[in-house]
Amino acid sequence: MLHYTRLGRNMGLGDAYVKKVFDSVATKYDMMNDVLSLGIHRIWKKHFVEDCVCPLPGSKFLDVAGGTGDIAFRITDSIRARGQSFGIVPKTLDGTKVVVCDINAMMLKEGQKRAEREGYMDIDWVCASGEELPFEDGAFDSYTVSFGIRNFSDRPKALREAFRVLKVGGALHVLEFSRVTCPLLSVPYELWSYGFMPQAGRMLADEESYRYLVDSIRAFPDQETFAQMIRDAGFGYVRYENLTGGIACIHTGVKTTPTPITPTTSSDIPAQNTSEATCEVKPEPNSA
């Protein structure tokens, strides 16, 4: 699921080592996420897909760094449910396209196995870098990336690629770990991340791999910094929403023009500090 070669260079690790890290967790990645987050990641992802992405039949979806297919499956399920409510046959995705793009072939293989096992036969799987997407300009209505963008070495380039492949009116949706904003959670989260998670990782797969993942979380920009990066890539209507006291965050931006708009430096819309809030997009405030 992760862009291991470039991330490895950033952290001073060899490509072979970092590839080994993510290959080692590929078969247990989803299960380990359940154990290490106590299942909370499922609540975040449900809110992310159903309330923020809001998939509609007939749309084109690209999920980047989504090798095991979790978000793509949720998008597919949501489309089928919405299609049924509109009187569309729910077993087909006629006119809808869901594409998973990932640079890690083993993650993709695990996703394809699950797709075959659970009947998700309408999903396309593409092995490619999020920084060099093999898709035409304006090909998608929605670009999602869940717990993956922190591992891109050139995030500005990845965001520009997201802008390029989206249609005008298309939306960028990013779900990622972030900076804790609730003081009461800071110390417990630190103990959880650097105490329990690596030890649990050692029992389920290997400690080194999950210590590596925790370090990548710490290295990711804070909410405001990343929101500005999205603006700098040309997106409008940029906003973010903190989940569980800022442990995770949903970032949203809209491609409002064919070419990138001039970035603003205005402060973002205040984050909503509840995972139950919806992701209704509102205009950014004017710059001071």
UniProtKB/Swiss-Prot annotation:
The keyword Mitochondrion applies. It comes from the Eukaryota. Pfam families: Ubie_methyltran. Its EC number is 2.1.1.201. Residues 260-288 are annotated as: Disordered. Residues 260-270 have a biased composition (Low complexity). Pathway: Cofactor biosynthesis; ubiquinone biosynthesis. The keyword Mitochondrion applies. One of its GO terms (biological process) is methylation. GO terms for cellular component: extrinsic component of mitochondrial inner membrane. It is a peripheral membrane protein. GO terms for molecular function: 2-methoxy-6-polyprenyl-1,4-benzoquinol methyltransferase activity. It catalyses: a 2-methoxy-6-(all-trans-polyprenyl)benzene-1,4-diol + S-adenosyl-L-methionine = a 5-methoxy-2-methyl-3-(all-trans-polyprenyl)benzene-1,4-diol + S-adenosyl-L-homocysteine + H(+). It is found in: Mitochondrion inner membrane. S-adenosyl-L-methionine binds at T68, D102, S146. PROSITE patterns: SAM_MT_UBIE, UBIE_1, UBIE_2. Keywords: Membrane, Methyltransferase, Mitochondrion, Mitochondrion inner membrane, S-adenosyl-L-methionine, Transferase, Ubiquinone biosynthesis. Residues 279-288 have a biased composition (Basic and acidic residues). PANTHER family: 2-METHOXY-6-POLYPRENYL-1,4-BENZOQUINOL METHYLASE, MITOCHONDRIAL, METHYLTRANSFERASE. Belongs to the class I-like SAM-binding methyltransferase superfamily. MenG/UbiE family. Methyltransferase required for the conversion of 2-polyprenyl-6-methoxy-1,4-benzoquinol (DDMQH2) to 2-polyprenyl-3-methyl-6-methoxy-1,4-benzoquinol (DMQH2). Component of a multi-subunit COQ enzyme complex. This is 2-methoxy-6-polyprenyl-1,4-benzoquinol methylase, mitochondrial. It comes from Leishmania donovani.
